Curated annotation (Swiss-Prot):
It comes from Opitutus terrae (strain DSM 11246 / JCM 15787 / PB90-1). HAMAP family: Urease_alpha (MF_01953). Belongs to the metallo-dependent hydrolases superfamily. Urease alpha subunit family. GO terms for biological process: urea catabolic process. PROSITE patterns: UREASE_1, UREASE_2, UREASE_3. This is Urease subunit alpha. The gene is ureC.
Length: 588
């Protein structure tokens, strides 16, 4: 006679199933399970679970005959998967050779039916059978949320310790520029020149993080830019502190089109070489990734935010303005003076700073995120941004917008707050991956991609991960006292794991470079251990390709009042006085 469980008992044992709702941390956001691939495959009662007296034992949920070649290397059981491409689904997740090979139902085909991946592996054209054997490790995903590792596309590589902060928050890919605590790096995300690029690519070997470097894009002639792409740069960065003139923009985009790399831009705050209209004309309809598109982080004052309505622009935010709060304005003035080498004793420097910090456009930025008109979130690490808070501030913004404007209608994901949750998740996972040409390997949990995964307990979602996997191997974890008799005694804090050590580190992390550099043989004798992965498909993309964030409103900014309108409607909201995912999580 089958055992009957209440819905609560089932959720406590095997995790939530279709129709169950899960709160994300202490926000007002609820996600509802849309599909249960385990139940669809083998039916309820056919789940597998590890532990004493549980299912994954020899001859039961574990095959006694499966050889290594046929078995998963790792299975995450009964996980709640949150992914902007896949939706909100319950499934087992199978990993082999560092890649996601199956999402569905795993176990022992000798005694279980309905096993295997729901999705085809693009490398084989087949669905993986998801066999658990003697070669298979297990992570219990029951009651956990699994997302793809986060991607931060706006990194000032000022110090290597940023990587520890970022991975502790759930970021697994960092893209940007710099050479350490140099004055140029404090302000601009550029690793200029072949020699500096080689040193940073060599340094990347030491860290459990996918890394890629932008070169300096401000140059009036193409030859110096070509040299940097051939040296391994994944893209070019135009920054106003180096002179972002229409001529420099035009040359830079021309080289990017030639080599299929992305261009990121921080536009001309002072409007010295032209207004926002001149910059948009210089784009000539070519793809470009605009950093801190609201303008507090830099850009044409007061109306750079207009670019969020251009079809060729991939707009991103940086996290200090996310979300708009009662403290945002005061904090930004001090940050800006430091980061851009300004002097409080020089009136022109003070005026420059004040021109960039506008409550009206920051409030509109909240609204544009909720509309899906700003597609990407990033940090601007140590240069007016916090590298460990991309994920937190994304979800704080989503919470604030639900509080102020209510539920967000979404046709494909109408249940609970699924549509809003997936829209905001896309801003730090799949959309930055698409923008920077790395979506073929990271950015989602789709079968065939690198197994860069983050596991959260729902109460700690977006704030403090339990585990961070790089290339299918645990690299970082919330770990207790190493001298304790069990893993959990306090103090628990983030510690590097075996995936962050030795050759396991270089086997499970990627360094992104240009295809041109690989074709040119730039790294043939470089002695690098990490896999070099080329960026691709950077140029013929646009806002239409931004997952769940492809809105193209016509945006206007009043030059006197800074009021922002989208399609004729004023965009504004009140600053938050209280936020979730804040002090209650960081008392110690």
């Amino acid at each position: 006679m089958p055992l009957k469980l209440t819905r609560r008992q089932y959720a406590e044992m095997f995790g939530p199933t279709v129709g169950d709702r899960v709160r994300l941390a202490d926000t007002d956001l609820l996600v509802e399970v849309e599909r249960d691939l385990i139940a669809e495959g083998g039916g309820y009662g056919n789940e597998i679970k590890f532990g004493g007296g549980k299912v994954i034992r020899d001859g039961m949920g574990q095959s006694p005959t499966a050889r290594d070649a046929d078995s998963l290397d790792l299975i995450i059981t009964n996980a709640l998967i949150l992914d902007s491409r896949l939706g909100v689904i319950k499934a087992d997740l199978g990993i082999k050779h560092g890649l996601i090979v199956g999402i569905g139902h795993g176990g022992n085909p000798g005694i279980q039916s309905g096993l295997g991946s729901t999705f085809v592996d693009p490398r084989t054209g087949k669905k993986n059978p998801m066999i658990v054997g003697a070669a298979t490790e297990v992570i219990a995903g029951e009651g956990c949320i699994v997302t793809a590792g986060g991607i931060d596309t706006h990194i000032h590589f000022i110090c290597p310790q940023q990587i520890e902060e970022a991975i502790s928050s759930g970021i697994t890919t960092m893209l940007g520029g710099g050479t350490g605590p140099a004055t140029g790096t404090f302000a601009t995300t550029c690793t200029p020149g072949a020699w500096n690029l080689r040193r940073m690519i060599e340094a990347a070997e030491a860290y459990p993080m996918n890394l890629g470097f932008l070169a300096k894009g401000n140059c009036g002639t193409p030859a110096p830019l070509r040299e940097q792409v051939l040296a391994g740069a994944i893209g070019l960065k135009l920054h106003e502190d180096w002179g972002t003139t229409p001529a420099a923009i035009d040359v830079c985009l021309g080289v990017a089109d030639e080599f299929d790399v992305q261009v990121a831009i921080h536009t001309d705050t002072l409007n010295e070489a032209g207004f926002v209209e001149a910059t948009i004309r210089a784009f000539k309809g070519r793809t470009i990734h605009t950093f801190h598109s609201e303008g507090a982080g830099g850009g044409h004052a007061p109306d750079i935010i207009r670019v969020c309505g251009e079809p060729n622009v991939l707009p991103s935010s940086t996290n200090p303005t996310r979300p708009f709060t009662v403290n945002t304005i005061d904090e930004h003035l001090d940050m800006l003076m430091v980061c851009h080498h300004l002097d409080t004793k020089i009136p022109e420097d003070v005026a420059f700073a004040e021109s960039r910090i506008r409550p009206e456009t920051i409030a509109a930025e909240d609204c544009l995120h909720d509309l899906g008109a700003i597609s990407i979130m990033s940090s601007d690490s140590q240069a007016m941004g916090r590298v460990g808070e991309v994920i937190i501030r994304t979800w704080q913004t989503a919470h604030k917008m639900k509080q102020q404007f209510g539920a967000l209608a979404g046709g494909a994901h109408p249940a609970a707050d699924n549509f809003r949750a997936l829209r905001y998740l896309a801003k730090y996972t799949i959309n930055p991956a698409i923008a920077q040409g790395i979506a073929h390997v990271v950015g989602s949990l789709e079968v065939g991609k690198l197994a860069d995964l983050v596991l959260f307990k729902p109460a700690l979602f977006g704030v403090k991960p339990e585990l961070v996997l790089k290339g299918g191997f645990i690299a970082w974890a919330n770990m207790g006292d190493p001298n304790a008799s069990i893993p959990t005694p306090q103090p628990t804090f983030y510690r590097p794991q075996f995936g962050a050590a030795g050759r396991a580190l270089t086997s499970t992390s990627l360094t992104f470079v240009s295809q041109a550099a690989l074709d040119h043989g730039t790294f043939r004798d470089a002695g690098l251990a990490r896999r070099l992965e080329p960026v691709k498909h950077c140029r013929r993309i646009g806002k239409r390709d931004m997952v769940l964030n492809d809105a193209l409103p016509h945006i206007e900014v009043d030059p006197e009042t800074y009021t922002v309108k989208a399609d004729g409607r004023v965009l504004t909201c009140e600053p938050a006085r209280e936020l979730p995912m804040a002090q209650r999580y960081f008392l110690f």
